[in-house]
Amino acid sequence: EIAVVEMGASHSGDIEKLVTYVEPTCGMITNVGRAHLLGFGSFEGVKRTKGELYDYLKAHDGLLFLNESNADLVEMARQREMNRIMTYGQSDDANVQGEVSECAPFLRFTWRNMATTESKARTYDVQTHLIGAYNIDNMLAAITIGLHFGVTPEQINHALSHYIPANNRSQLEVTAKNKLIVDAYNANPSSMAAAVENFKLMSVEHKMAILGDMRELGEVSALEHQKLVDKLAEDGFKEVWLVGEEFGKTQTAFRKFKNVDEVKAEIAARCPENYYILIKGSNGIKLFELPELL
């Protein structure tokens, strides 16, 4: 009855082409980050390409699900004077509102539907199995879409609280030696900054980060990798392993490895123990091979 299709893009015009195949009646951009800059040319290129979905929805009277908390997305919608919008976010103006209760380490949050016909919107409390406060936007997006298509709040809460990630995205793995935060499917400056910031705020001892190159950043690659290692140093991280050619060019005292095989050799010789370890990098760096060794 409902098809959910990801509009993947790495070059300008990709979305414009895909919407002609799919002809969406509803649409949502979850985020605009500094990803695939090699293909898009710039952050403005990212916004312009993703905005091609908005252009199609506007022309065909489609419904836009909009994150009211994301200034870039709000501005993109405002520029196009979108016809039909259902909003969500950590904002008092959103139709579906939510806020983080805790991340210890899993995200717990509350939400309410301000667009309800009831005299007072009910507040719901949801405990998830997701790592990272940044995931509240994903939760609110799912809630908003579910409500639009007639899914009850009770069904929504049950689905979100029982979802356990198993795709190397924001998942916690507990081994005999360590606790791992595995987010090794993809990485760009925006998502890496969010993951590191969340890790910094976690009130646990013995933190360690194993970070892989952020691919496809083009001419800003050196700058973005250096900015990240500088931020890690400023935030007081002591145990950081950097993996890949781009991190290898940075000026830092953190340990560097050319590839994942060198990391495996180090783990075999001296496996870290009793650490909370953040593992994040672009999929091509293959950090997803590390959890079974740690």
Language model features with spans:
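Short SAM/SAH-binding signature in class I
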Residues: I2, C26, A141, P272-K280
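Active-site beta-alpha connecting loops in nucleotide-dependent enzymes
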Residues: A166-N168, A184-A253, S282
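Switch II (G3) loop of P-loop NTPases
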Residues: I2-S12, L180-N186
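A glycine-rich beta-strand to alpha-helix segment
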Residues: C271-L294
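Short acidic-hydrophobic, aromatic-tinged amphipathic segments that line or gate anion-handling sites
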Residues: F254-V263
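Short amphipathic alpha-helix with an adjacent loop that forms part of the alpha/beta core around
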Residues: T20, K264-P272
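Acidic, Mg2+-coordinating active-site environments of NTP-dependent enzymes
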Residues: C26-K179, V204-E205, D230-E239, E246-F254
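Switch II of P-loop NTPase G domains
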Residues: S10-V22, S190-F199
